[in-house]
């Protein structure tokens, strides 16, 4: 289960980074902001999983 969450975090980070870059490239501030928000969500999920791993071991 934790592996699924880690993969989901990486996917959110990559998707958000790509969306933010695309938004900046076309001058769409809303798309860039949404992409950054998705990346941040992935960052938060990854931090949560790392914290869980610390207490697991």
Swiss-Prot record:
Matches recorded under Pfam families: CsbD
Composition skew (Basic and acidic residues), residue ranges: 1-15, 36-57
Region (Disordered): 1-57
Region forming the signal peptide: none
Coiled-coil stretches noted in the UniProt entry, renumbered to this chain: none
Entry-linked SUPFAM superfamilies: Hypothetical protein YjbJ (SSF69047)
Superkingdom of origin: Bacteria
Family under the similarity heading: Belongs to the UPF0337 (CsbD) family.
Name of the protein in question: UPF0337 protein SAV_1088
């Amino acid at each position: 289960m934790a592996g699924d969450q880690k993969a989901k975090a990486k996917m959110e980070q990559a998707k958000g980074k790509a969306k933010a870059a695309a938004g900046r490239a076309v001058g769409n501030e809303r798309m860039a902001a949404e992409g950054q928000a998705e990346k941040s969500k992935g960052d938060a999920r990854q931090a949560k999983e790392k914290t869980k791993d610390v207490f697991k071991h």
